[in-house]
């Protein structure tokens, strides 16, 4: 098989729902990233085989195709959009790497985009053209069959109860996320990932959801979202707007084009779990991935596990025995935000910039009861 490597990765700063990016459609969120890659790597962008993007709550159609055309890329580049719910961005990266492995192509753009602020409303179609009742809006997308389809909050509570994750543990983890994100934004680690771009005349270059002044006392005052529950708005991720792009390339092609550093794709795993406990999807996915490569968690230097809810991250960490000092070391989605279709690609982007970590994993728990995980190693092409 051919060896895929990721030689470039960038994201925009993530906006909060209804925040500074609220007026921008998904295509507009992607445009500065496409433009940046075109300016930095014109030869690479002229040789693209395809653009593979994750998106979950967009307008429909083929967003990857529309976005690349809006950005002025060659019309001969096709484009495909993937929906594996919150795992879409990671799935896009995995699929690009698999295409390179198979020899189907040598250069791909992979990533994801989401605008929760611009997500369209959806209504049920009337059964009859003569129906006169007021249209019924969908509250959310269905993820599983009736009776086995909890809301995200219900699923997070299910995990908290099953794995005995207390309210204090969840709040402590959320506090850690904000503290680490704030620290690593200020010291420049997270800033490496972010491409600043102008929004209404001013540069947008910091994630809007990070709360450096947040205290445990404030978190403790928040009411649970469900009666007698432990999940709150404070120990959960926010709804966000954001976009991420990466360049995936065949190793020898990368060397020919002068690239000497990045991360190489090793393997991936995708596994189904009970929809009621969807948040622990990373557990079987990571276990399968490690077994495939005859590794243990001790062989992994850093793990990026999407922080949809504190409860599911803590449960996954405990079941996988991940040392806390290897988990989400720069903070996670509880602080920086969760633009659904982009989040998995953002995890890989973070690993790309953790240049002192050799062997790393990105993993997601996914609506409907799925976990996916991908293993990478630091790559030097010289």
Curated annotation (Swiss-Prot):
InterPro entries xref list: Thiolase, Thiolase-like, Thiolase-like_sf_Thiolase, Thiolase_C, Thiolase_CS, Thiolase_N
| Keyword Calcium among UniProt keywords | no
Source taxon at top rank: Bacteria
The Gene Ontology biological process annotation of the record reads: fatty acid beta-oxidation; phenylacetate catabolic process
Q: Write down the top EC class of this protein.
A: transferase
According to its UniProt record, which residues of this chain constitute the active site? Answer: 86 (acyl-thioester intermediate), 338 (proton acceptor)
Q: What UniProt keywords apply to this chain's record, in alphabetical order? A: Acyltransferase, Transferase
CC per GO annotation: cytoplasm
Q: What Pfam families does the database record attribute to this sequence? A: Thiolase_C, Thiolase_N
What the entry lists under CDD domains is as follows: thiolase
Q: Does the keyword Acyltransferase apply?
A: yes
* Its EC number(s): 2.3.1.-
Q: Name one GO molecular function term.
A: acetyl-CoA C-acyltransferase activity
- PROSITE patterns the UniProt entry points to: THIOLASE_2
Where are its TM segments located? Answer: none
NCBIfam families membership: AcCoA-C-Actrans (TIGR01930)
- Do you know which PANTHER family this protein is assigned to? 3-KETOACYL-COA THIOLASE, PEROXISOMAL, ACETYL-COA C-ACETYLTRANSFERASE YHFS-RELATED
The family annotation for this protein states:
Belongs to the thiolase-like superfamily. Thiolase family.
Q: What's the protein name?
A: Putative acetyl-CoA C-acetyltransferase VraB
Source organism: Staphylococcus epidermidis (strain ATCC 12228 / FDA PCI 1200)
Classification lineage: Bacteria, Bacillati, Bacillota, Bacilli, Bacillales
């Amino acid at each position: 098989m051919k060896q895929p490597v990721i030689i470039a990765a960038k994201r925009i700063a993530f906006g909060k729902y209804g925040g500074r990016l609220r007026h921008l459609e998904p295509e507009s969120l992607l445009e500065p990233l496409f433009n940046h890659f075109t300016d930095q790597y014109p030869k690479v962008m002229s040789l693209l085989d395809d653009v593979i993007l994750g998106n979950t709550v967009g307008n429909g159609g083929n967003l990857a195709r529309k976005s690349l055309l809006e950005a002025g890329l060659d019309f001969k580049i096709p484009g495909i959009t993937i929906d594996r719910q919150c795992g879409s961005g990671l799935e896009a990266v995995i699929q690009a790497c698999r295409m390179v492995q198979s020899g189907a192509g040598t250069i791909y753009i992979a990533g994801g985009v989401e605008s929760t602020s611009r997500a369209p409303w959806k209504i049920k179609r009337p059964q009859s053209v003569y129906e006169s009742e007021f249209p019924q809006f969908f509250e959310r997308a269905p993820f599983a069959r009736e009776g086995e389809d909890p809301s995200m909050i219900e699923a997070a509570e299910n995990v908290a109860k099953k794995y005995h994750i207390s309210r204090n543990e969840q709040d402590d983890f959320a506090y850690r996320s904000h503290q680490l994100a704030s620290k690593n934004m200020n010291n420049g680690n997270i800033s490496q990932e972010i491409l600043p771009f102008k929004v209404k005349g001013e540069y947008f270059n910091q994630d809007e959801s990070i709360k450096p002044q947040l205290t445990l006392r404030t978190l403790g005052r928040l009411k649970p979202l469900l009666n007698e529950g432990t999940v709150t708005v404070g120990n959960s991720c926010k709804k966000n707007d954001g976009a991420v792009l990466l360049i995936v390339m065949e190793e020898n092609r990368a060397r020919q084009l002068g690239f000497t550093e990045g991360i190489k794709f090793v393997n991936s795993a995708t596994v189904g779990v009970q929809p009621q406990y969807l948040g622990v999807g990373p557990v079987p996915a990571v276990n399968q991935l490690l077994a495939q490569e005859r590794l243990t968690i001790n062989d992994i230097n850093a793990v990026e596990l999407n922080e949809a809810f504190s409860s599911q991250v803590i449960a996954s960490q405990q079941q996988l025995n991940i040392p806390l000092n290897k988990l989400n070391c720069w903070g996670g989605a509880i602080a920086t935000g969760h633009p659904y279709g982009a989040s998995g690609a953002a995890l890989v982007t973070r690993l790309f910039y953790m240049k002192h970590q050799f062997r790393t994993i990105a993993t997601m728990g996914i609506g409907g009861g799925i976990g996916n995980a991908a293993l990478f190693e630091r790559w030097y092409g010289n």
